[in-house]
Design a protein with these regions (language model features):
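Short beta-strand/loop motif that positions the catalytic acidic residue
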Residues: 355, 361-363
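Accessory cap/linker subdomain of secreted extracellular hydrolases
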Residues: 245-351
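N-terminal cap/lid segment of alpha/beta-hydrolase-fold proteins
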Residues: 105-139
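The serine-hydrolase catalytic nucleophile loop
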Residues: 153-165, 179, 373
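Conserved alpha/beta-hydrolase
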Residues: 167-184
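Conserved alpha/beta-hydrolase "acid-adjacent" motif
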Residues: 368-374
Length: 450
């Protein structure tokens, strides 16, 4: 089983599964534990560890070097850790000083929770009340501030986004908000990129107003679906930088096509077999893009033709696999719960070509949910044309820029974030550029930096 919740990550595929009820079955995190222990702690070895709420009564720790694990409560009041999103114990024991304290002992190293200047803020966008939080390092100095933009997740960013603390611990402010239809915000959940971009612009405007004299520079950061939203938002308001993780420079139909191709090619199927699989996927994509209103005859014809093919059992894509086993009647019933106004054929390239905002894109070579090959190629072509883009490519990273193991059943299990991932975000927010080495990331920088 791959990791259930990632930092700022929920792909279209994961989002569709969630809407089918899987996420709804996860128990809510204990409010008391969240209140007591969530925070960013500075340790005596001069590193920081962030503690965030998770599922099934657990906590999640993250360090800036990319290591992470789940914390499980024990009867003696301590917490034991399992590595990444695996079930393997990593030997880490953690204890807290109780609900009235700010102390932690993390793997034998003492630490203290870091205090930030925190402002809870309500603002409006297109008639919808949104709830946000501005988190700043303590002091009076000007700081860059990152507006954290959602992926496609349904959960509350105010609760789940650990960057709202990890960045301030590095001297960078963060504005986090629950997008419409999630958490404490009003409105209806949507995947309308344009509307979400206007919400992000409203968040940036609110940030400028509340940060006042402390605002140095300002920019957007987001992952996955935010790869479509962030550049749109940056085209509508003046910002100093934009950071996209595991996003796409193609549309959502191409996303599924490329996912099918990557998955089947890695399983060793021939080019001819993959071409046939892509035909089936294209028929499924047409059904979902139509709002489950047409395309069923072609889908049925191709399913009947290829259901006996050896590759059919491995045909998944980003969302094709949800369509394949269901009848027309079942799919039509599903239509209302997927009525999210998703612009399936949205072309992001005109916005990317016209951008004058320095942008950092962080991509994973093993990303099944948002395959990066064509996106990387397109971004590199923009760099060759003189655009101000930086691409950091982690060959072995999957969606979320996490590394993984493969278990005996062939399932990926995420183990940690790629080394250098969080440092990339920090340095680009601080300087509008990156320099040096970030783990094994392959960097393509704008021509002006060469």
């Amino acid at each position: 089983m791959r990791q259930p919740i990632r930092l700022l990550v929920v792909s279209v595929r994961f989002l569709l599964v969630a809407a089918s009820g899987i996420l709804a079955s996860l128990p809510a995190f204990s409010e008391s534990l969240e209140h007591c222990f969530v925070g960013n702690y500075h340790l005596e070895d001069r590193s920081d560890v962030d503690i965030s709420p998770s599922v099934d009564g657990t906590l999640r720790w993250r360090k800036f070097d990319g290591t992470t694990g789940a914390l499980h409560p024990q009867a003696n009041g301590t917490w034991t850790s399992t590595r990444g999103w695996t079930k393997a114990a990593d030997g880490m024991v953690v204890s807290f000083a109780g609900c009235d304290g700010n102390a932690i002992r993390f793997g034998g190293i003492a630490g203290t929770r870091t205090d930030f200047d925190v402002h809870e803020i309500t603002f409006e966008s297109h008639g919808t009340r949104l709830v946000g939080r501005l988190v700043l390092p303590r002091g009076e100095a000007k700081v860059p501030i990152v507006v954290l933009v959602h992926g496609s997740e349904h959960d509350s960013a105010l609760t789940s986004y650990s960057l709202q603390r990890m960045l301030p611990a590095q001297g960078i402010g963060a504005f986090v908000y629950d997008k419409r239809g999630t958490g404490k915000s009003g409105g209806t959940y949507t995947q309308d990129y344009s509307l979400l971009a206007y919400d992000a612009v409203a968040a940036a405007t609110t940030t400028r107003s509340f940060a006042g004299a402390r605002l140095g520079s300002i920019g957007f950061q987001g992952g996955s679906q935010a790869g479509w939203v962030v550049p749109l938002a940056a085209s509508r308001t003046a910002v100093d930088f934009a950071i996209v993780g595991f996003g796409l420079a193609v549309n959502a139909i191409d996303e599924d096509q490329q996912s099918v191709e990557l998955q089947l090619s890695e399983k060793g199927y021939s080019r001819g077999e993959i071409r046939d699989a892509l035909k089936v996927a294209r028929a499924a994509e047409k059904v979902i893009a139509s709002g489950f209103s047409n395309g069923f005859a072609e889908l049925d014809r191709l399913r009947s033709r290829y259901s006996g093919a050896r590759w059919y059992k491995d045909l998944r894509g980003d969302y094709t696999y949800l369509i394949l086993p269901r009848s027309e009647a079942e799919l039509r019933i599903m239509a209302p719960e997927f009525d999210w106004h998703t612009p399936w054929n949205y072309d992001p390239m005109p916005v990317l070509r016209s951008s004058r905002t320095p942008q950092l894109w962080i991509l994973g070579g093993e990303d099944y949910d948002a395959p990066s090959r064509e996106t990387r190629k397109r971004l590199q072509s923009l760099i060759a044309e003189g655009r101000d883009y930086t691409v950091a490519y982690y060959k072995n990273a999957e969606h979320g820029i996490t590394l993984f193991e493969v278990d005996a059943t062939g399932e990926r299990i995420s183990t940690r974030y790629a080394p250098g991932y969080f440092q990339l975000i920090r340095d680009f927010a601080l300087h509008g550029t990156v320099s040096g080495q970030y783990g094994d990331a392959e960097l393509t920088r704008p021509l002006r930096h060469d």
